[in-house]
Amino acid sequence: MRITDVKVTVWEWKDVPPTRYTLRVKTGSRTAQMALVRIITDEGLEGHAFLGSALSALGNDPNLIIERFKPMLVGQDPLARERIWQSISGWAMGGIMRVIGAIDVALWDLAAKAAGVPVHRLMGSFRESVPAYASSAVFESAEEYAQEAVSFKEKGWTAYKIHPPAIPELDIKICEAVRVAVGDDYRIMLDSTWSYDYPNALRVG
């Protein structure tokens, strides 16, 4: 089996819900670009992966796949994922890692289809189920977090992950408010997206 083509289909996601994961991102609804990466083989199998997000533009990513990486992929054995990774990962810098990641995901998808199993089986999964948690956006007040956490708990979610504003004093108040609201028997987590230095990480923790 050999790779014969690589295609990227770009579309617009209109009216993205007003969600944010940092205070620096506007909260109004907007339009985002997404893309589907397709790695096509001579045996009719295709590997698929998504590229892009609701929070960032695609920029030059689709062109990078077609102009830089497609010539490196066509003719390769798609099951030789590690060899392909070694050949393309030298370009891994900045935003290009998004592109390389999409290619890698598409290759895993293709390999799973060739084997007739889900991707997680190829990766050695052994559980039949895993616990799921609810994740917040960024809000401006502790009360909003507390209300949302209670709502998720009542809906049966087993844990709640807080994306705080990344202001240590406020983040501590948010954690305290959520803990009071959901009780001591409910798991909460904090994802500050690399915002703290070491002293503040210890302080908030």
Predicted regions: what they are:
Residues I40-A114:
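Metal- or metallocofactor-binding catalytic centers and their adjacent structured scaffolds
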Residues I40, D104-F139:
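Glycine-rich, aromatic-flanked loop segments that form ligand/cofactor-binding clefts
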Residues M1-H48, A54:
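Structured beta-strand/loop patches that form or line metal/cofactor-binding pockets in enzymes
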Residues T31-A32, N60, L64, L79, ...:
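Conserved active-site and cofactor/substrate-binding residues in soluble primary-metabolism enzymes
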Residues E128-G205:
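Metal-dependent enolase-superfamily TIM-barrel catalytic cores that perform enediolate-based chemistry
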Residues V8-W11, D42-L45, P71-V74, P78, ...:
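Generic secondary-structure signature for well-ordered alpha-helical cores
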